[in-house]
Amino acid sequence: ANAEIARKIIDHAGLSDRIHVVLGTLGNGGQTLDHLESVCGLSAGGLDFIFIDHAKDAYLPDLRLILEKGWLHPGSIVVADNIRVPGAPEYRAYMKKQEGKLWRSKEHKTFAEYQSIIPDIVLESYYLNN
């Protein structure tokens, strides 16, 4: 249902030729990765922006798959939601360790979805490819 709503919004905005809604996970044995390459035409350096907001323990493994594919280019932006609540500690630690080497990141303080009193973090990262 969410994917269909997203497609309608994208179509209404006139961006259907530039944005693909893909159902699946990157860690499903290559099926989604293959789809992104063969159907969507994704190739080396082809991603300008990624928004990560799914299973928190998959943030880092999925980012690593994207890096292995070479889909990012210097200046690609990755935004990860809910870094603090419920949390993606491995992803956050990786970005801190790679600061100034592979990534330049900034933490944006926000609040958990539907909970305006619970602090959360959105992590914005710029790919340096150093």
What feature does the model see in each segment?
Residues 18-20, 46-48, 74-77, 103:
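Residue-level recognition of the N-termini of beta-strands and the immediately preceding loop/turn
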Residues 50-53:
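Hydrophobic beta-strand segment of the Class I
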